[in-house]
C-alpha cells in the first residue's frame, strides 16, 4: 500500500525562490545583468512616464572578492515612493503599481523582488532603499528582506531625515552574487541600447573596475506618457468581468455597466450586444448569473463592429528620437524610422516602430545588428527565439538594395502594448502572435523602402561621378582643340584660351563632384597639358 501524498501550497515568493530562472536569474552573470536591468527600468518608469527628464546613476561595486558579491546601486530623480508603500513594493512578490491598463516597462510585480529573493538565497545583506516623493520634506530610508513563507516584507530597519537638499527620487542598493567578467558586455550593451531610445535621459555608469561612462542628454523632448484606459471588450474574459463587477462602487444596470466600464461601447453598441446575448438592459449587473456572464463574453468575442482599442494607453518613442539615438551611437551615413498606426491583438492595442541605420561607422558583419525593444525595454538575451529576429531574418533584404552577404546595417524594432506577449517572466523574447508579426513585417518593409531609395540615389550619384571623372582626362585635349579653333592660328591666344577653357570645364565638372579635391585635379591637369 502506497504512502499518502502530502499536499502543501507555496507562496509566490517561495515559488520564484525555487524557480529563479523563470524570472531571469539562472546564474550569477545573468542575475547581475537582470538586477541592473530591473532597477534601471523602475527608475525610467518613475521619471519619463511622469514628465521628468531622467538623471540616472548606476554603480556596481565588488564588496566581497572571495564570494564574488556585488553591490548594485541605482539612483534616480523620479517621483519617489510613498513611505507607506515601500515595504510592499520591495518585499511582497506580485505587488505593484503597474497592474493598470496602460503601457509600462514592468508587468508582473516581480522584477526587483526576484533580485531580492536571489540575494537572500546567497548572502544576508538586506535591500537598502532611500526615497523621497516630490515636494516631501523628509527622506525615508529602509532596509528590507522578504519573508518567503508568508510573502511579506521584513522591515530590518527604517528611518527618515530632513530633506535639506530638495531631493526627490529613489535610491536602491542590492547586494547579489554575480559574475562581472561574463556579464560585463551585456550590461554595457543594455545601457547603450536604453540610451539609444531615451536620448532625453542622462546616465552615469561606474563599473566594478572603476570605469565611469557618461551618456549625456541629447534633447529635452520626452515622448507623450501613456494614459490609463478602460478595458476593451475583446480583451476580457469571464473572470475579469467578475472582478470588474465586484469592484463597482455604483449599482449599475447591465447597460450602464457596458457603457461606463468599457471603451468602444456606447448606447447603440450596448443595445446590440445585449440583444445578441439575450440579456435585459435594465437587469442589475450584480445579479448576472455565471451562465449570463459566459454569454456576454462570448458575444464580445463574436461582435465584429467594435472600434479598435484606444492608443492613449501607449507611449511610442517617436521617429525623431529613434533617429537621434541611432545617429549618436552608430554614426551612420543614413538613418530612417517609422512609427506605424495603432493596431490590436486580442483586444490589446499595440504600435510597432522600426528604424534602420546604414554605413558610416557601423561594423560590417554576416548579419545585421538587430536592436529589439518591448515597451522601451532593450531585449538582450534569447535573440534568435524572438519574433522580431524571425521577421528580420525572413525579410528579403536584396529586394531593398542590400546585395551583399556582408551587412553594414542596424535594424531596430520597438513593440509597445498594454500586454506584451513575452515567452517568460524574464521578459527577453516576444512570442509569435500573428497580428504582431504581420505588423512588424509591415514596419520593416516600410523603413526598408526608405533605405532602398537612399541606396538607389547613392548608386546613381556614384555612377554620375564615375562618368564625370572619366571626362576629366579629356579636358586637356578638348580645351586645346577649342582654343586652336577660336584663336585662328594666333599662338599667344591659343595658350590663353586653353587655360581659360580648361579652367571653366574643370570648374563645371568639379561642381558636380563636390567631394573631389580641386587642387589635386588642377595639378594633374597641368602636368598632363604641358
Curated annotation (Swiss-Prot):
The protein's Enzyme Commission number: 5.6.2.2
- Tagged with keyword Cell membrane: no
Main function:
Relaxes both positive and negative supercoils and exhibits a strong decatenase and unknotting activity; it cannot introduce DNA supercoils. ATP is absolutely required for DNA cleavage; the nonhydrolyzable analog AMP-PNP generates nicked or linear products from a supercoiled dsDNA substrate. Generates staggered two-nucleotide long 5' overhangs. The enzyme is covalently attached transiently to the 5'-ends of the cleaved strands.
How would you summarize its activity regulation?
Not inhibited by the DNA gyrase inhibitor novobiocin, instead inhibited by eukaryotic topoisomerase inhibitors such as m- and o-amsacrine, ellipticine, and the quinolone CP-115,953. Radicicol inhibits the ATPase activity.
**HAMAP family in the cross-refs:** Top6B
Query: What would be an example GO MF term here?
Result: DNA topoisomerase type II (double strand cut, ATP-hydrolyzing) activity
Q: Which family does it belong to?
A: Belongs to the TOP6B family.
User: Which NCBIfam families does the entry mention?
Assistant: PRK04184.1, top6b
Can you state the subunit structure given in the record? Homodimer. Heterotetramer of two Top6A and two Top6B chains.
Q: Which Pfam families match?
A: HATPase_c, NFACT_N, Topo-VIb_trans
Q: Where are the transmembrane segments?
A: none
Q: What is this protein called?
A: Type 2 DNA topoisomerase 6 subunit B
Cross-referenced PANTHER family: DNA TOPOISOMERASE 6 SUBUNIT B (PTHR48444:SF1)
Catalytic reaction list: ATP-dependent breakage, passage and rejoining of double-stranded DNA
Name the InterPro entries on file. Answer: TopoVI_B, TopoVI_B_transducer
Describe activity versus temperature.
Optimum temperature is 70-80 degrees Celsius.
* GO terms for cellular component: DNA topoisomerase type II (double strand cut, ATP-hydrolyzing) complex
Signal peptide (from-to) = none
State the superkingdom: Archaea
Sorted alphabetically, the Gene Ontology BP terms of this entry are: DNA topological change
Positions binding ATP in this chain are 42, 76, 96-98, 107-113, 427
What would be the name of the gene that encodes this protein?
Answer: top6B
Protein keywords: ATP-binding, DNA-binding, Isomerase, Nucleotide-binding, Topoisomerase
Entry keyword annotation includes Isomerase: yes
